[in-house]
């Protein structure tokens, strides 16, 4: 009788993530578990089929072999464990191990995998990024099962040596002239079999869980900075070390300031009269308002530097500056008296535009010369 497609057994697609495959397995395993279906041979057969499919599709090597060769690529009956095939494994293990510098691993047991690293995207306001703070983060992860202490075996039981690979975690497959080693499909490369799996983690040794961490964000962080929290990633397989958590920082746009490295920039509107006559204006900083002296005859677009009013570097602790660009605003909603005063002022400039507006005079001289050259 031909076997069903493993992806069909679990009801997943070929591009489904490992986490989703695990979710599908747990859902089906709970449904067809023999403890929930006592005496039901069909349910027992389905449970075995589901477990077999899960073991293949969550092992990267076996999954790759299955995707390429189908059931033939993961069927241990197509290989062997005795006779001269062990010699082939020794020969090729020695030769290729010496060539590639890895040393011969032979039939050594596969080590339980380290936990996966996790990434958390953290968005901060500019004020939070500049000043630093402590954030409470809720992290979905895989944690060691507290019922079986991460062993995967039912409480009071333990794993037994795999009869297929005899505890080695690897078997040999014959492919023509070559004998190739691969992870044992029976024990998933561990060298041990869990006959009585834990009812909580279903033999995985890990369960999905959310945990809350207090993370200190240093002052001066910026978009693209990454904070590493060692050991706060997913739990490792069956007691292996956990992964790490990486907090990826991004800073929201600010209504007033823009940031470039450790410097801050802002635009400050000033009136026509203030630009012409000079005076003091108030400008915003992250520490509050400060006074800025505007010289007489200040042109729009002029930049003023306030030293030490920028951001303290998270690495060197040097402090940047605040650069204020003044922008002269044209007055609006004028009454008749104000308009008349401006007309009188404009009249006093007649014939003296070069004296009072040197940039404009230079501009119009350039335009005049342009058309003269164009028509010559």
UniProtKB/Swiss-Prot annotation:
GO terms for molecular function: ATP binding; heat shock protein binding; unfolded protein binding; zinc ion binding. GO terms for cellular component: cytoplasm. Zn(2+) 1 binds at residues 145, 148, 198, 201. This is Chaperone protein DnaJ. A zinc finger (CR-type) spans 132-210. The keyword Zinc applies. Binds 2 Zn(2+) ions per monomer. Belongs to the DnaJ family. Pfam families: DnaJ, DnaJ_C, DnaJ_CXXCXGXG. Residues 5-70 form the J domain. One of its GO terms (biological process) is chaperone cofactor-dependent protein refolding. Participates actively in the response to hyperosmotic and heat shock by preventing the aggregation of stress-denatured proteins and by disaggregating proteins, also in an autonomous, DnaK-independent fashion. Unfolded proteins bind initially to DnaJ; upon interaction with the DnaJ-bound protein, DnaK hydrolyzes its bound ATP, resulting in the formation of a stable complex. GrpE releases ADP from DnaK; ATP binding to DnaK triggers the release of the substrate protein, thus completing the reaction cycle. The keyword Transmembrane does not apply. It comes from Shewanella frigidimarina (strain NCIMB 400).
